[in-house]
Each structure stands twice: as C-alpha cells, then as structure tokens.
Amino acid sequence: MNVVKHTKYIWELEDFISEGEIEYLLGMFNFYNPTIVESFRNKDRENDTYIITDHPDLDAMAWKWVNAANEYYVKENQFIFYNWQKDLMFAPSDSNTTTWRGQNIIRMYNESDSYEWHGDQSPTNHAEFSYIIYLNDDFDGGATRFMNDKLTITPKKGTVLCFPVDHYHIHKGVKVSGGHKKILWNCVYRHEIEMIAKQPYLTATNVPRSSKRCIW
C-alpha cells in the first residue's frame, strides 16, 4: 500500500484492495443483481445507484474494506482529533464500545454520466468520514474533483479515497467520457452519536433538501 496525502484530510490509500478481491466482489454483484435505486438518478446525480445491504455476503465484503480503511485513516491521521481514545474506537463491538455504521452503496457511471458538486451527508445520522473505493480504472474521465482545494483525483483500481464529511470537502464526479466507472461508497458514523429525529423535532425530517446533496 502507498499512502498519498494530498492535504491534511484528503488521502488516497493506493493498492489497498487487491485486484482479485475486487473481481470477486464484482462477480458477487453480478450474481445477486441488486435492484437499482431509480429515484436517485436526476440531472445532478447521473449514475446508477445500488444499495447492497440486502445481500449479506456482498455487504460483509464491502464492510471488510471500509472498516479497514476507516481504522487506518482515523488512527494514522494526526489531524483527526480522537487522540485520547482512538484504540477504543476500534475495539470489538459490544454495547460498551464504539461501533462504526453506515451503508454500502455501489455506483455505476455510464458514458456521459457525472455527479455534480455536492457534500456527502445522511438525513438522520451524523456521518464523519467518506470513503470512495475505485473498483476499476479502465475508463476515460470520471475523476473526483474537490472544489475548495482545487484538487483532482484520478481513479485507480483498488484505491480508497478518504476525506471528512463536512461543508468544506465539496466535490464532484467528473463526466465519464468513455467506458464505465464503478465505485463502492460509504460515509460512516458512530452509533453513540446517532441522530434520530423524534418529536417535537419530527418536522425536521420534512425540511426540503438540496438535490445536490448526497443522501442515503
């Protein structure tokens, strides 16, 4: 593995996942053939989105990658301020320890597909870190571009792109000019600060959200 630190917070973990593992996951994806989320695609979010939580084998393999990337990124990044208990945050899960949660999503971009400027978020949970895993690189275009850092990341198969979920790291998926782009995405949160809308704040879930936001 090679770690590229573009900024304090935007990291690439190159060669983090082997080609064999990726091909195995893509084979499982084709076998299970998850249902496409038809409602996700619009003029700002041009991609085919699949939620894979209904397929335990597929989801477990994705979590293996996401958990490993998350543990490395959080523990090794000195600018992520959990220094007093980082090890505890990755202890075996039980009712007294931190558990990271999220939702594994596979996105397929066809030729001319793109994803306009957006910030990653969840409508109900306080997501902290976003992970984009590039499942292939045999396509043209399709880079990930960050607005404020004026940074463009070229997808590389087996690489994990890591960055915080906040209002600074606005990014986009550049148009795919040839071929098909495939990614696995998850933005994770800690269950002990999970935010569930309850009365008298239930109306908060009905507040209009920008279509340019990435929601689960």
Segments from the language model and where they lie:
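Fe(II)/2-oxoglutarate oxygenase catalytic core
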Residues: 1-160, 168-216
